[in-house]
Amino acid sequence: MPTTLLQSDLPGLPLRHRGKVRDVFDIPRERLPAGTPPGDYLLMVATDRLSAFDVVLPDPIPGKGEMLCQVSNFWFAKTAHLMPNHLTGIDVASVLPEGVDPALYAKRAVVTRKLKPVPVEAIARGYLIGSGWKDYQRTGKVSGIDLPDGLRQAEQLPEPIFTPSTKAAVGDHDENIDFDAMVKQVGAEMAERVRDATLRIYKFAADYARERGIILADTKFEFGTDADGRLYIMDEMLTPDSSRYWPADEYEVGTSPPSYDKQFVRDYLETLDWGKTAPGPTIPAEIIERTRAKYGEALQRLAGISVD
């Protein structure tokens, strides 16, 4: 069983942000290896924290952060020909404070460029599920995009669509917006660049996953720019937390297919009399272990990496 990390505390590295899953630290210039190009850098740590319905739950999933980080790193490398990413290749151990065990962070942390985030979640959908299905049932559209009549739950869309959403703070909920609203927020050129990159990467990843018996139903990306306005993909990439993966052999139109993510946790929480606000309830050990196994299976099938 891997070591569990619920929260990272690294003396000498200023904490910049503690999100639902990731802790992000500024790296002082003197801690960077000699010859590091000018600019600001971050240490991003994927913890084992578990969130559902935008609430961080009290029980972690052992090794989840390592699995998420490895999936992201796999996809960053796999898609580097399509889009530059925030990774630097700087060894994590070289920037850790003295006395910190590098083994604890080796598989769950990365050194990244510090970028200016594009303030919109970039979502690609290839199938009608989740909030997209709810929008379609209500309006016949998803994020203002007209879709054919008579589509069923989990049905593949004629073409993948781009459906942006707002970026919510921890504890708040993202809200779907249409493309025009995104243009007003970030400008037409940036909106088009993000949309085109999102769909290009989604199509590539969906084809790759399909060859391995997995359907990539939808996914969420985050983008940022450097001082020269160059666009990068950042944060996490095509993980079971940011994406909806289905086993192709269990896919059936008209149903909500099982997924390689924390669906066991969400299903359990739906049985409770809980208002979906903090603090969250305790999760049974069986649910934790089944969820951990699902993350591990996704890592194995997509990247060929086995977990302990």
UniProtKB/Swiss-Prot annotation:
GO terms for molecular function: ATP binding; phosphoribosylaminoimidazolesuccinocarboxamide synthase activity. CDD domains: SAICAR_synt_Sc. InterPro entries: SAICAR_synt/ADE2_N, SAICAR_synth, SAICAR_synthetase_CS. It catalyses: 5-amino-1-(5-phospho-D-ribosyl)imidazole-4-carboxylate + L-aspartate + ATP = (2S)-2-[5-amino-1-(5-phospho-beta-D-ribosyl)imidazole-4-carboxamido]succinate + ADP + phosphate + 2 H(+). Its EC number is 6.3.2.6. The keyword ATP-binding applies. PANTHER family: PHOSPHORIBOSYLAMINOIMIDAZOLE-SUCCINOCARBOXAMIDE SYNTHASE. HAMAP family: SAICAR_synth (MF_00137). This is Phosphoribosylaminoimidazole-succinocarboxamide synthase.
